[in-house]
Amino acid sequence: MMDNNEPISAEHGQAGENLAMNYLLEQGLTFIERNVRFKFGEIDLVMKNGKEWIFVEVKYRSKSQYGGAINALSSGQIKRLRRAAEHYMQLNNIDAICRFDLIAVDAGQIQWLPNAF
């Protein structure tokens, strides 16, 4: 049985990211990049909506027990994602509005929270 705090496999994580990316593409967002890694944090998906840059954290749970994916985001993860996004924008000379979205995938059900944090 998977505990809510137990890490999920990379394979399941990729499946969740694929579902999230396809969902966001269907909503009209533009895909830029995925799995951007820095030593201090990772960005699951980088998307755009017009001129707005969107940094997406994807949380996946195969079962919705223990509060589900939507409750799996910690304050430490938020801090690391914000730092990674800031670094990404500096490296790519991006001077634009950005936001942070959360995609929660629970047992195949997708919940999108724009401006989640």
From Swiss-Prot:
One of its GO terms (molecular function) is nucleic acid binding. Disulfide bonds: none annotated. Pfam families: UPF0102. SUPFAM superfamilies: Restriction endonuclease-like. It comes from the Bacteria. Belongs to the UPF0102 family. HAMAP family: UPF0102. This is UPF0102 protein Ssed_4252. It comes from Shewanella sediminis (strain HAW-EB3).
